């Protein structure tokens, strides 16, 4: 009886997908739950406080609230589903906006604007829709760190639109895709 019930459930789910083109809705979207919106790490490396960034524009939260990551790999991934709202010609920074209006800036390294795009490659364009985990930018970590600090601020630039921004992971090792921030309206 259990096997038959499971088969009916599976068949019913597949049938609804095939007939109606949609999957049954979950009670809550994990990335936009009642607890807040989740930002996942765009990089693998070491999670740090913004206070550890040797640039007052970031450490004093002038551009927004968030965290910093000292990258161990040269790949920036989408930290949530959203749209590429800003892409700098110098390829060192990207702005993303999610469907709830949260605006996020990922700024690879300090003073890397001066590289003029050298050692960076973008895989998306401004206006593109991206999914969590999509590769956005690759960069030559070894070459850039020869001349620049590669610590990467990850900022909610419209932080004033939210009641709370909570760091979800202890400072230390972080993998791309780990939950790092929760942002609450």
Locations of the language-model features?
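Short glycine/threonine/proline-enriched tight-turn/helix- or strand-capping micro-motif at secondary-structure
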Residues: 51-75
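Zn2+-dependent peptidoglycan hydrolase active-site motif and core
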Residues: 83-113
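Conserved, short, structured surface segments that act as functional micro-motifs
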Residues: 134-168, 173-174, 182-184
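Short, glycine/small-residue-enriched coil/turn segments at secondary-structure junctions
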Residues: 35-39, 67-92
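Short, well-structured beta-strand-loop connectors
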Residues: 41, 45-47, 77-84, 124-138, ...
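Short, conserved beta-turn/loop elements at beta-strand boundaries and strand-helix junctions
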Residues: 50-55, 87-92, 141
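Short histidine-centered loop motifs in beta-beta connectors
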Residues: 106-131, 164-173
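Transmembrane alpha-helical segments and their short flanking loops
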Residues: 1-36
């Amino acid at each position: 009886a259990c096997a038959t019930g499971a088969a009916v459930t599976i068949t019913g789910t597949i049938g609804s997908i095939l007939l109606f083109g949609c999957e049954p809705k979950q009670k809550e979207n994990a990335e936009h739950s009642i607890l807040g919106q989740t930002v996942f790490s765009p990089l693998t490396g070491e999670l740090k406080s913004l206070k550890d960034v040797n640039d007052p524009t970031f450490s004093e939260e002038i551009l927004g609230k968030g965290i910093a990551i000292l990258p161990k790999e040269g790949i920036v991934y989408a930290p949530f589903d959203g749209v590429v709202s800003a892409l700098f010609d110098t390829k060192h920074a990207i702005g993303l906006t999610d469907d709830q209006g949260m605006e996020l800036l990922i700024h690879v390294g300090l003073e890397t604007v001066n590289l003029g795009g050298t050692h960076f490659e973008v895989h998306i364009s401004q206006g593109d829709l991206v999914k969590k985990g999509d590769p956005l930018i690759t960069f030559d970590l070894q070459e850039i760190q020869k001349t620049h600090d590669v610590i990467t601020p990850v900022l909610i630039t419209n932080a004033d639109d939210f009641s709370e921004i909570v760091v979800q992971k202890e400072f230390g090792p972080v993998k791309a895709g780990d939950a790092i921030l929760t942002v609450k309206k």
